[in-house]
């Protein structure tokens, strides 16, 4: 892959690298799924925002630098090369923010985007329900109009970041008697609202990365409706496209992991079979392929093209790629992967954490089975049955 960067983009890369060298934490922060780790990651978001590094492709008036997506990819490459912290604000800045920019009113943009950029408001997702996980159109949580408020009643589950976050974006049913994709609306809800209860859900490592949310007649101002009333399915699909497509998982994240995998292999190759080396090569090649495909896609977007089914293909590729990469690391380490500290620990258990998270990749952001169905129907033209 040969990419010709402009002189401005080359200088931008130097600026990012120098800033991160000075400001990025020297040690890994605690898990953002703990209160301590969440607070420290929020402070890091504020550090990024202070010098407008948190969202370089956002408009200047909302806390960004007004740069293009190629510059964002450059930033991501330097960010992950510096081993900077994961973005606790990702639900907001990568998923909700572009949705607000597309569907929100000017008042909503001015109200929600600046505190999102600054790290003052951290957002959670509130989509899935006990009987509406992958089948999001089966949502039953309802929001009944009462004057200038909606009254929300129902339950959400697997709400990422909801244990410690400030706000959530929720898909609810606003039209009585509606079914499936019709009659849904997307509304923005403060998580400290009266009548809203959070119940943490422990992950494999014991940390509460998700929460159940119970809405008992929670009153939400009508101005928190994002997009058209009863037209929330299209708004939600736009957000899902951002989640599956370009923004949530940049190639740099996986390239950095692949570089660490190569280093890990070199340190242990004397006791490994040649087949493991081939797996490492494949993992590294996959990340480079994903990077090339992403640059190509970004170039098309900047030329005015829209993306649709590419988001599903993207999600399929990065989730399977991540799982293969981390499974290869586990093969190299064997039982040592279980150790988080001590003389025999490798990278403080980081690979094990990454492996457990990679197992969820084919599930969140729409299961890979659903993505394959989308591609089969919309790209290949195959029948639904």
Q: Where are the model-predicted features located?
A:
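C-terminal helix-coil-helix/basic helical segment that borders enzyme active sites and/or dimer interfaces
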Residues: 28-35, 266, 270, 274-277, ...
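Glycine-rich phosphate/pyrophosphate-binding beta-alpha loops
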Residues: 132, 157-162, 204-205, 360-367
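A short core secondary-structure module
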Residues: 148-149, 153-199
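Internal helix-loop-helix
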Residues: 49-110, 114-120, 161-167, 287, ...
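A structural signal for short hydrophobic beta-strand segments in well-ordered beta-sheet cores
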Residues: 141-144
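Glycine-rich phosphate/cofactor-binding loops in nucleotide/flavin-utilizing enzymes
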Residues: 2, 70, 74-75, 95, ...
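A short, Trp-centered hydrophobic/proline-enriched beta-strand micro-motif
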Residues: 119-127, 171
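Glycine-rich beta->alpha junctions and the first turn(s) of the following alpha-helix
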Residues: 3, 7, 196-292, 361, ...
